[in-house]
């Protein structure tokens, strides 16, 4: 299991003021980077070829996966977090044609939430990512056992 406290991408200082000034789309843009780095960090072990890393990461950073993970997080979110999610979801532009608009919007809300937590509450972000990591590792283990 990844030790999130030692993860190199967690902020040293939170910045709630900066987060309040950012648009939901900007939070989502930032959250997308946070999430992809988190996913890459998870799949670094065990060592494997770069192509295998890439396929695993792509499978988990897709809008469909992000929307599914938001469904998992939903019951664990505070009212304020759900507000950030909704703002991100509602700010989403039309996504790629391969993804239904509802899924794309939900993924954008998920990214906005992660971006917001990165800037405002690193401990909460750590808790959220730890919960996601449990689900991701369980999915990977189930897929490998087939």
UniProtKB/Swiss-Prot annotation:
The active site is at residue 32. CDD domains: RIBOc. One of its GO terms (biological process) is rRNA processing. It comes from Synechococcus sp. (strain PCC 6716). GO terms for molecular function: ribonuclease III activity; rRNA binding. The keyword RNA-binding applies. Its cofactor is Mg(2+). Homodimer. Pfam families: Ribonuclease_3. It is found in: Cytoplasm. The gene is mrnC. InterPro entries: Mini3_fam, RNase_III_dom, RNase_III_sf. Keywords: Cytoplasm, Endonuclease, Hydrolase, Magnesium, Nuclease, Ribosome biogenesis, RNA-binding, rRNA processing, rRNA-binding. The lineage of its organism: Bacteria, Bacillati, Cyanobacteriota, Cyanophyceae, Synechococcales. Involved in correct processing of both the 5' and 3' ends of 23S rRNA precursor. Processes 30S rRNA precursor transcript even if ribonuclease 3 (Rnc) is inactivated; Rnc processes 30S rRNA into smaller rRNA precursors. One of its GO terms (cellular component) is cytoplasm. Gene3D superfamilies: Ribonuclease III domain. Its main location: cytoplasm. Its EC number is 3.1.26.-. This is Mini-ribonuclease 3. Belongs to the MrnC RNase family. The keyword Transmembrane does not apply.
């Amino acid at each position: 299991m990844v030790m999130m406290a030692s993860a190199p991408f967690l902020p040293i200082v939170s910045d709630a003021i900066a987060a309040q000034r950012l648009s939901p789309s900007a939070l989502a843009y930032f959250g997308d980077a946070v999430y992809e780095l988190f996913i890459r960090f998870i799949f670094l072990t065990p060592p494997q070829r770069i192509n295998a890393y890439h396929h695993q990461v792509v499978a988990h950073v897709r809008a469909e996966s992000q929307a599914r993970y938001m469904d998992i997080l939903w019951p664990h979110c505070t009212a304020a977090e759900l507000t950030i999610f909704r703002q991100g979801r509602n700010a989403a532009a039309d996504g790629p044609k391969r993804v239904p608009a509802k899924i794309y919007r939900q993924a954008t809300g998920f990214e906005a939430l992660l971006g917001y937590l990165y800037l405002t509450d690193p401990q909460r972000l750590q808790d959220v990512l730890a919960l996601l990591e449990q689900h991701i590792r369980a999915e990977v283990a189930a897929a490998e056992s087939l």
